[in-house]
Amino acid sequence: MTAFEQFHGDLVAAASDLGKSTPLLIAVSKKQSLEKMHLVYEQGQRHFGENYAQELADKANKMPANCCWHFIGPVQSNKIKIIAQHADWIHSLSDLKHVQKLETELQKLNRTINALIQINVDSEESKSGITKEEDFIELAEKLVRSNKIGLKGIMMLPKLHKSESELEHLAAEIKRYKALLNSIGCQNCEISLGTSSDYREALKIGSTMIRVGEKIFGKRI
């Protein structure tokens, strides 16, 4: 059994134990070789996550056409054109100016993209994401009106290994942001949350997308 098959089996079992649907597994292929990516592709994986726009472009041009590409890194204004060209999902929107530029590039390309708003739930200075509710609402309302960017939910990068009380707080925050999205017309929200280190906790509090890299690929280049 390969590392990918082992982890996927563990993920399915963990979701089943919790009475949850199996989340979408995003194979984080940052700094992973095309050879390794082809191996997990042959085992059925189709969703790949990249942190860097140029690496996304290079790999999207070389992997099979039916791969689905998730941009999960911090958004840089000068890389938005590349993201618009190659990504099917963007998990890390948190800036109105970036949204406007992305929309302009998508119009030129006649493409659409699925989007998640990144929330900096622990207000960490080292991480991107929205920290204020009013900024979240403003951005969400802009995205809901877009005909090129489909708002699908939220992404979080919380600190690992939270206590039970911290997990309860995080679950309450997820519920609050989902309610805000529902109130402006975004239903069936996706929650991009959890890695190989904390996916069980993430599943428990509602994650629908898990991002995993070395656990299924091995060490990066």
Where are these regions (language model features)?
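Conserved alpha/beta-domain cores
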Residues: 1-197, 203-205
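Gly/Pro- and small hydrophobic-enriched strand-loop and loop-to-helix capping segments
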Residues: 91, 207-221
